[in-house]
Regions:
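An internal, acidic/charged active-site-proximal segment
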Residues: 45, 50-180
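Active-site-proximal, Lys/Arg-enriched surface segment
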Residues: 1-48, 160-170
């Protein structure tokens, strides 16, 4: 979806796994992803005539190109888990996995917490209807914020010049700490 044109356009999305030591950043893995689209008559935003006019070459089933084609159609969350798993098999160690709000989901939380590593997942919450099990019951993020304000648990950081609060909760049967 193009936020400039306010409509869907043909394109692809890039998914990158990088490692940083605070000074340097190294790309470990990447994959390109596409979507079929919502209109069944215009798969990937193309008419059948446009799809048939595209270059096509039959390749060996075990070729790298076919591997990339399978990745192109794969879910980005599934692929990100595979990328992290592959990096761990290659001996890459990390303390934190920083992800976008799109990837802060139950599947990735389960994967990271099921590893026998001392690592943390840092990601942004979606401020939607997702419920987290807290001492006060099953609450969504806006309700948790209101509750923290009423309990006067919100603090101010002079150094960062912002207000913050946190609460321990449970999500996807895993203990998490939520910061606001």
């Amino acid at each position: 979806y193009s936020h400039v044109l306010h409509r869907s356009i043909l394109g692809f999305k890039g998914l990158f796994l990088c490692h940083t030591d605070g000074k340097t950043q190294t790309m470990l893995d990447f994959s390109l992803h596409g979507e079929e689209g919502k209109n069944p008559e215009k798969i990937q935003g193309l008419t059948s005539k446009q799809r048939n006019a595209r270059f096509c070459k039959v390749r060996d089933e075990k070729s790298v190109v076919n591997t990339r084609i399978r990745e192109y159609k794969q879910s980005k969350i599934e692929r990100s888990i595979e990328m992290v798993r592959h990096a761990m098999k290659k001996g890459i160690r990390f303390d934190y996995l920083l992800v976008d709000s799109w990837f802060t989901c139950a599947d990735l939380i389960r994967f990271i917490t099921s590893r026998h590593l001392e690592c943390h997942l840092i990601g942004m919450l979606k401020m939607g209807k997702t419920r987290y099990r807290t001492e006060a019951g099953n609450l969504n993020a806006p309700v948790i914020i209101d509750r923290l304000k009423k309990e006067k648990s919100v603090r101010y950081s002079r150094k960062l010049n912002c207000y913050y609060a946190h609460m321990d909760a449970e999500y996807a049967n895993r203990k998490i700490r939520i910061f606001f």
